[in-house]
From Swiss-Prot:
This is Protein PAT1 homolog 2. Residues 105-120, 154-171, 180-198, 208-221, 355-373, 436-445 have a biased composition (Polar residues). The keyword Phosphoprotein applies. Residues 94-120, 134-221, 338-374, 411-445, 765-787 are annotated as: Disordered. It comes from Arabidopsis thaliana.
């Protein structure tokens, strides 16, 4: 600012103060001296034209030397008390036309004044700043003369709503203060342009969004500049003479920057607590009673320092508060109320200021300590949040055993031979609900999880996939009555049970519980028994004593499941998970031996289906190898009592050899058990299990000899005219030689003679061989049996 401009400015201020030396009369304002509940603050509901600025004649600059005409201290105290009450009303409980309680988290929507107060989204920070402004400017307002008795607008009060639109800018918007053109004290020619509140350039107290580095070049101008209270309180340029005295006696901004614990590291200041700042500002207010030593020099000094201090102060405070959103500001509103004004405020910010920092402020305001909050018409935010948590827990599991099972299983299989084998087991096991014991209950207990998946408590009663009410005369069946559909549903549910059993086994292997796994083993046994019950298998040798004859419909569920290739896979997996030698293993194996022709009667052309049948035969063989003589006798009796003739083919037959494989394993296991259990030269009639075995084997041997005789007659009739070598090859290809060899250890003398006669009729046997066989006491080696 030029020296001539400063002199004109000083003369104008002196003349204005001489002509307007009247005392400030607060009683002419309608809201002074009245009850605050009955005050209707002017301007909030006024739809008229808003004044752009105040004429120069309303508020005149005055010199500090005219302080003698300020009036008594009691008037100042009354005015301060009135403004203090007004401030408490603003920040206190909710009244008509006044912003509601801070602790309530919202304000009254019914009040028209409250609606006007919410013109922008950033007014939350204005409440805290407004408290600082009112207390800082009490002395300045009390010392200003009133020029016009008709003036009813006071720009520094909290009741003027249009000033709010300007004060809202510094909540989250960076305020860019140009250093080259900014002047706190305009020249007389430009005074009218900056007298209006809409043209005032302020240094905000709580800005956000701007970034600045505290480097030496940036902080150096601050150390030489004076910290003016008018910069913080956003005072208009009319109070220029007051700024002059602040420049002479106020604390410097450089000193405050040199104290990082107060400006930077103070958590209360960064989080909306302005008590420390307010205390320091009030102390500075009492130190401003001394007049400036040289007003002319002060005016010139203020012009230079104000440009530097306010520019750097804006950048400094923008950095301090841009990355530290105050929780108290968030608590003023719920997230739902903020979202109501988000669209309008964002649109207005993008139109006026670019909208970059506004979007950042909106995102920051939506982040609260309790997480996201939702608004709905029929549900509360807690209910919506609980549903989202349930869905997230079901669809976003942190267990790699569930999310990345195939990769983890591949790693475990790849490193099976290494020392550091990865532990493949679930972090928690599935909790199965207990099934209702009431047999008369026809409705299954259905559990629906968060994702809508329906878990059946029992697979023996699958839930209907489609409910359709058909006419009684219609011959169509319900979908649940279709046999294969019900079988597929049962297979899928049974595989789910088997997966749970595998999880229990892996948990027992890698993570043994404190009780040694007794509870998990009990749970595993219950699941296996429930699956056997679901298959509806019949046990003629059950301990209940019900030894009734078998019917064709006894194993109907078992047959329907094993009709499908996936059902055979289920049976194979189930046999592999059974504990060998248990009653469940015996019951399942008896069902397999009753239906040897159904399971192993033909070899399918599909390689995968053929492999499934071969795996089923191997699984049955493993279970048989752990059976005792009683279980072996029951399985062999199941073969004899079956209504179907077993396919007694030689092992390696192209038509399928599964039945012969399991029968050979049964006969060999029985020979081992008999030798270990029954002492030699002891009568077999004393052991009931041995008697059952003898009866079962006699029936089986009779069945085997009949099959061999019929097969021999068929082969001999087809190859009667052929040579002996061709006949011998045909007999070898069709006769079950492995079954005959496995049966030799269980035959008596009559049965051995029969086998000898079959061998003689099958091919010529040398007389010397027959003589040696007779001399050996009737013991016939397997080499003697041809074919």
């Amino acid at each position: 600012m030029e020296r001539s401009d400063s002199r004109d400015f000083y003369n104008f201020a002196k003349t204005s103060s001489d002509n307007n030396s009247a005392l400030f009369d607060a009683s002419q304002y309608e809201f002074f001296g009245q009850s605050l509940e009955e005050v209707e603050l002017g301007g909030l509901d006024d739809d008229g034209t808003v004044r752009g600025h105040v004429d120069d004649e309303e508020y005149h600059l005055f010199d500090k030397r005219e302080g003698a005409g300020l009036g008594s201290l009691s008037d100042m105290d009354d005015l301060a008390t009135t403004f203090a009450k007004l401030n408490r009303n603003v920040t206190g409980p909710k009244h008509l036309g006044v912003i509601g309680d801070r602790g309530s988290g919202s304000f009254s929507r019914e009040s028209s004044t409250a609606t006007d107060w919410t013109q922008d989204n950033e007014f939350t920070s204005w409440l805290d700043q407004h408290t600082v402004e009112e207390q800082v400017q009490e002395a300045s307002w009390s010392s200003q003369p009133q020029s016009s008795p008709n003036s009813n607008s006071l720009y520094r009060t909290s009741s003027y709503p249009q000033q709010q639109t300007q004060l809202q800018h510094y909540s989250s918007e960076p305020i860019i203060v140009p250093e080259s053109t900014f002047t706190s004290f305009p020249s007389p020619g430009k005074r009218s342009q900056q007298s209006s509140p809409s043209h005032i350039h302020r240094a905000p107290s709580l800005p956000g969004g701007s970034q600045s580095n505290f480097s030496a070049p940036n902080a150096s101008p601050l150390s030489n500049s004076t910290f003016h209270l008018s910069g913080l309180s956003h005072g208009p340029s009319h109070y220029g003479n007051n700024l002059a005295r602040y420049a002479s006696c106020g604390p410097t901004l450089g000193n405050m920057v040199q104290q990082p614990p107060h400006w930077v590291t103070d958590p209360g200041l960064l989080h909306g607590d302005h008590s420390a700042l307010l205390h320091s500002l009030m102390q500075q207010q009492h130190l401003q009673q001394l007049p400036p030593r040289n007003g002319f020099t002060s005016q010139q000094l203020i012009s230079l320092q104000q440009r530097q201090s306010l520019a750097h102060l804006a950048a400094l405070q923008s950095q301090l508060y841009s990355s530290y959103p105050s929780p108290s500001h968030k608590a003023l509103f719920g997230v739902g109320e903020v979202r109501e004004h988000k669209h309008k405020s964002s649109h207005r910010s993008r139109k006026n200021r670019g909208g970059i920092s506004q979007q950042t402020s909106d995102l920051a305001s939506q982040k609260s300590e309790s997480g996201l909050q939702f608004r709905s018409k029929y549900m509360t935010s807690e209910e919506i949040e609980s549903i989202l948590k349930m869905q997230h827990s079901n669809s976003h599991s942190s267990d790699p055993y569930v999310n990345d099972y195939y990769h983890q299983a591949r790693l475990a299989k790849k490193s099976s031979g290494s020392r550091t084998k990865p532990q493949l087991y679930p972090s928690h096991l599935k909790d199965h609900q207990s099934r209702s014991r009431n047999s008369s209950d026809q409705q299954p207990q259905v559990h629906v999880d968060a994702l809508g998946k329906i878990t059946l408590p029992s697979i023996c009663r699958p839930r209907a996939l489609l409910e359709v009410d058909s006419p009684p005369s219609s011959g169509h069946k319900h979908l649940e009555d279709e046999p294969l559909v019900a079988a597929r549903v049962t297979i899928e549910d049974a595989f789910g049970v088997l997966i749970d059993i595998v999880d229990i086994d892996r948990t027992l292997q890698f993570n043994r519980p404190q009780d040694g796994g007794a509870q998990l083993r009990r749970k595993r046994q219950i699941l296996l028994e429930g699956l056997a019950t679901s298959l509806q298998l019949v046990d003629p040798f059950s301990k209940t004593g019900q030894k009734t004859g078998l019917t064709t419909k006894d194993d109907i569920v078992f047959l329907r499941i094993t009709t499908l290739p996936k059902g055979r896979k289920l049976l194979t997996k189930y046999l592999q998970l059974l504990v060998p030698g248990t009653e469940i293993a015996r019951v399942v194996c008896m069902a397999v031996f009753r239906h040897l022709r159904f399971l192993f009667g033909g070899l399918p052309s599909d390689s995968l289906a053929a492999e499934t049948i071969a795996n089923l035969a191997k699984a049955v063989t493993v279970c048989v190898q752990a059976m005792d003589l009683r279980a072996l006798s029951a399985c062999l009796a199941a073969v004899v009592c079956s209504s179907e003739q077993p396919p007694l083919r030689p092992i390696g037959s192209s038509s399928g050899d599964g039945a012969s494989v399991v029968l050979v394993s049964l006969l060999e296991r029985a020979a081992e058990v008999i030798v270990a259990v029954v002492p030699p030269r002891v009568s077999n009639h004393g052991n009931p299990n041995d008697g059952l075995w003898r009866a079962s084997f006699d029936e089986f041997f009779s069945l085997l000899t009949k099959y061999c005789r019929s097969k021999y007659e068929t082969i001999h009739g087809q190859n009667h005219d052929n040579a002996a070598d061709v006949l011998e090859l045909a007999i070898k290809r069709e006769m079950p030689a492995e079954l005959l060899r496995a049966s030799l250890r269980h035959t008596n003398e009559d049965q051995r003679n029969f086998l000898l006669n079959v061998g003689r009729s099958a091919s010529p046997v040398s007389e010397s061989t027959t003589t040696r066989a007779s001399a050996s006491g009737g013991q016939i080696n397997s080499e003697f049996v041809r074919g």
